[in-house]
């Protein structure tokens, strides 16, 4: 039964990540860096209770080719090989809080919204500490960190960050979203977008 449950988790993760990578792309350019700053509020996930500041900087947006390569790896080899492929990707930017040196973002993609704003998708491999690697709690089966931001034309918005939870699909928009967008553990408030030169 444990093996069956684990297989189900892998299949669910694989399906969700396939949809993340197949988002209808906007122009993915590598111009000026884009910086997003938000106030994070922990909604029940292990870790700091917040609020705290999160900075996300994107220096490189994923190309269609990179997206296609990751999709092919996921479809043909599964989530473990997708994790390896993601880890081998060049740095797309970083995510950090004021008290950390930050973590590299490996995948960054954005698409336009109907109101003139944008939806930003960020993904990276999640740091797994010694205790977690040895004891393999349920969180060990979710090695990805995923961020979704919705930013208006005025550069302000909101978002969610998923560290130990799953992602899902918005079939109407044919895009990946955080599963249960309204109840994900880390809420990103007061998102502000800045362009760095």
Where are these regions (language model features)?
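Long, low-hydrophobicity ectodomains and other hydrophilic envelope-associated domains
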Residues: 29-197
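N-terminal secretory signal peptides that target proteins for export/translocation
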Residues: 1-7
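Bacterial N-terminal signal peptides
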Residues: 11-22
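Short amphipathic alpha-helical "recognition" segments used for binding
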Residues: 7-13, 85
